[in-house]
């Protein structure tokens, strides 16, 4: 696997540029934007990523994933997604030992390989589904090793990946379903639902123009 091991030193990020990106990507959400700017200021102070990630909690359709993409854009990092609702076996994350015929690396190691570098944003969708393991252990326990910044070991590759350059951004609908150890790894941002009028504005001024741009109709 071709992975470039990068320094976890972060150059200063212009808060005004960060705000411009947030305004371009998100409608309203003033408290959310301010919380993200505070995180950027902290990064500028230490030149490292915070020891905690962001947990975005709110109903479906409130732009949680879009917030995560905007943060990755501000940090100028590649991003990858983990959909916890589709993961029911820890080996899907950690990989399986080479002693087995169908052994292969786990999703996390594959994400590092696809990004080509060790510094990236992990967008963990539906974190509140992470405890739904079936028989072979709890996927949430694997996430804890990824979030601890002590390095992540894949069972297939049998090597440790530095994780100090990983910034996790998780989404959830119901934070009461998330274990206390996992919750302790995140700063929680509650995302309020949009009104019907706000949804119309978002569709006409944000969603539709982006779709038309992708289709080259603008």
Language-model segments: what does each one mean?
Residues 2-57, 108, 208-209:
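Pre-Walker A (pre-P-loop) alpha-helix and adjacent loop at the N terminus of AAA/AAA+ ATPase modules
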Residues 7-8, 116, 174-184, 188-218:
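Conserved C-terminal "switch" segment of AAA+ ATPases
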Residues 62, 85-88, 99, 127-130, ...:
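Conserved nucleotide-binding/hydrolysis micro-motifs of P-loop NTPases
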């Amino acid at each position: 696997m071709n992975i470039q091991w990068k320094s976890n030193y972060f150059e200063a990020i212009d808060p005004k540029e960060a705000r411009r990106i947030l305004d371009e990507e998100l409608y309203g959400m003033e408290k959310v934007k301010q919380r993200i700017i505070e995180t950027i200021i902290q990064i500028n102070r230490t030149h490292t990523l915070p020891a905690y990630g962001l947990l975005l909690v709110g109903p479906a359709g409130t732009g949680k994933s879009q917030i995560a993409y905007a943060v990755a854009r501000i940090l100028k990092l590649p991003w990858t997604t983990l959909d916890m609702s589709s993961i029911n076996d820890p080996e899907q994350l950690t990989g399986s030992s080479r002693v087995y015929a169908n052994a292969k690396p786990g999703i996390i190691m594959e994400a590092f390989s696809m990004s080509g570098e060790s510094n990236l944003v992990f967008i963990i969708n539906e974190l509140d589904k992470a405890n739904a393991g079936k028989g072979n252990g709890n996927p949430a326990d694997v996430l804890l090793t990824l979030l601890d910044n002590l390095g992540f070991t894949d069972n297939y590759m049998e090597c440790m990946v530095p994780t100090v350059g990983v910034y996790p951004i998780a989404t959830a609908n119901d934070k009461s379903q998330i274990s206390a150890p996992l919750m302790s790894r995140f700063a929680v941002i509650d995302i309020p639902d949009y009104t019907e009028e706000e949804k119309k504005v978002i569709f006409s001024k944000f969603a539709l123009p982006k779709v038309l741009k992708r289709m080259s109709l603008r």
